[in-house]
């Protein structure tokens, strides 16, 4: 997959299709990043989440892995000059590339796992998990196939349209969602928080490594009412 072709227009394509729903999902659990010192982001895209993270947490160092050179350029423009020393960009394929060493105390994948086939999704999840500190959180925003006949039909229609569009415009090879939640659980992570939008099509989640049953508190959601510039 190569997102260079649609990088400049991606934000507007997103807004046209979903309004602010994806943007809100990215920021739902931003409060979980408050104490993070090392953050790993896969598939950041045009930098909207990165910019908000740097503003919200002014001490964290951030490592970004992104395959699209054009997306990295857009993301770099969103990083203020005074904050550039805190961000390290790596243009690489997350499946085949070698990740920086951990430990990280926060991982972030927003609408990234859905572009991977099951085998590649499992490989990426294991690579990230191996670099997470015990107790670290992983923020995941993704599409899903929800329960309920009407909700499921709605989701499948949207997913079919999206996979078809990205197959044509980016060369995406995946054609359906990988079982990412099962893969995260199999890797030893536990979902401790979630929120759904768009009839269950969109799910923002917080997963924790080595989560104990006594630590299931939910952080307050961070509302967003306008697009990120």
Per-range role (PLM):
Residues 97-107:
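A short acidic, Gly/Pro-enriched loop at the edge of an enzyme's catalytic core
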Residues 40-41, 45-96:
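Class I SAM-dependent methyltransferase SAM/SAH-binding core
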Residues 19-36:
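Conserved alpha-helix/loop element of class I SAM-dependent methyltransferases that forms part
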Residues 141-187, 194-195:
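C-terminal alpha-helical "lid/dimerization" subdomain adjacent to the S-adenosyl-L-methionine
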Residues 187-190, 195-229:
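Core SAM-dependent methyltransferase catalytic element
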